[in-house]
Amino acid sequence: INYAVVTVVGALLAVNGHADVASLASYLVFVRQAAMPFNQFTQLSNFLLTALAGAERIFAVMEMTPEVDEGKVDLVRVSGYESGEESWAWVTPSGEKTPLAGDVRFDDVTFGYDDDQTVLANLTLFAKPGQKIAFVGSTGAGKTTITNLINRFYDVRSGTITYDGIPINDIKKSALRSSLGIVLQDTHLFTGTIADNIRFGKLNATDDEVIAAAKIANADKFIRRMPRGYNTVLTSDGANLSQGQRQLLAIARAAIADPPVLILDEATSSIDTRTEALIEKGMDALMAGRTVFVIAHRLSTVRNSDAIMVLEHGRIIERGTHRSEERRVGKECTSWC
């Protein structure tokens, strides 16, 4: 603004013969050079304030007391002597190994993010090995909270959650979370090749395993159409892919991890109808023999579930199959059928 004012005033003086053009040009250069240090100081001050705020947050995180993991039971991959295929097994503190089945149970679980808030109240449910359990309900009903508790991102206020009969508090957090494959509504990809992004689900995976996982998710065809195929470099957060393509890569990432338990949080919400139809076949193959939890806002996306739980205000108000829920004429069906 100051520079513009000086320019206008100087131009008027030059027009009226009170100053020549050369003097005006020299004065304008002087004004710009004189103002430059102040502008740079202002920018530097803003940068320093931002850096100080970031540093305070970093030190606050570094000074936080780490959560104590009291889990003693571990979970490892073991290879079959004859088939060579890997499977999951529990390892007790004594070293005894027991095959993992994938039985997940909630017994009278109550939970709230704050002491004066209850998100889930007296929740009881179970998922047998190989079953597909779906949760439907409005936003804030507690669907995602259930999956957060399975991951043990939070501890329950009362009640118990067991995994193959083992209380999840007795399982090492790293072991528990390594056995869970999660496909979220928002897909997070990293700068790097497509193959590396898929391999993030299993860092030591071979190229053949990467391709096999992509085929399960029906992502192989679009990947091969990319300029460099699986070696195509993705920009930050996969900005050079469509939302549907990013979602397919997230599904492939879950497939390569080969988890015994899958959590699908609106995994097809950002995919068009045609793409959704493409992944359904792959998802059926991916879910075979696994315990699956599906979060959805409408019943049409969970039609093949073994059981559908309709949640409202942290409670299960309906249980049934897709067919039985569609036949209901109450509030639940009219909202999500």
Model regions and ranges:
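Conserved E/DxxT/N motif and adjacent residues on the DHp alpha2 helix
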Residues: 60, 67, 199
